[in-house]
Amino acid sequence: KFFSVADAESAGITNTYSDATAAVAKWVISAYGATGDTVTIKVTEPNGVVVNLGTYTTVAGDSSIALLGASIATFINAGTVVHGYSATFSTATLLLTFPKKLGIFPNSGSPLAITIVGTVAGTITQPLGSGSTVQGVASKLAVFHYHISEFFRLQPKGVLYVGFYGVPSTYNFNEITTMVNYSSGKIRQIGVYLNGECHAYTSADLTAINTQIAT
């Protein structure tokens, strides 16, 4: 039973993406190039937004793959507070971690692009979920938080009852009756969020929901 967004957040329903998994891409460096070479790193986000992580210019001290990789990782991390991306480097592999808020978006296409001027060389692997890359997993809590915040935006003085239930063997939506009884009959409008990962909506679901409401 919530009287505000703050109540929901106190119950753990936040929009901090704590339950998400960040996507991870990798770049395996095969040649460290020469002093003055440039490496520009860009990532395409939803709606075609291109985030430029910056252009690193190699220096004399980048005299091996290991040294160059460490320098680029440090360069990326210096801008994390601005762009939200971070990097680690080991041996010849630079791992780029995407912001959790992007969810599953980086899992398809080629969001990471690296443009080189000079003789630095490497191979990109997008977040495929193999070979030390990681596919992103979207936050469910952020979705719940959004719907709750929209409820209170439209009705600041409203009272919202929220219930989470395990996956049933049969979708009869008895949970609706449970919610109404818990509220002592005060619920006047109800919404059902069905996790599509477990079960896709069918016309039979609508019939079952109507049965619960009608009785």
Task: Identify the meaning behind each predicted range.
Residues 2-50, 55-215:
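Polar low-complexity, Ser/Thr/Gly/Ala/Asp/Asn-rich disordered segments used for subunit assembly
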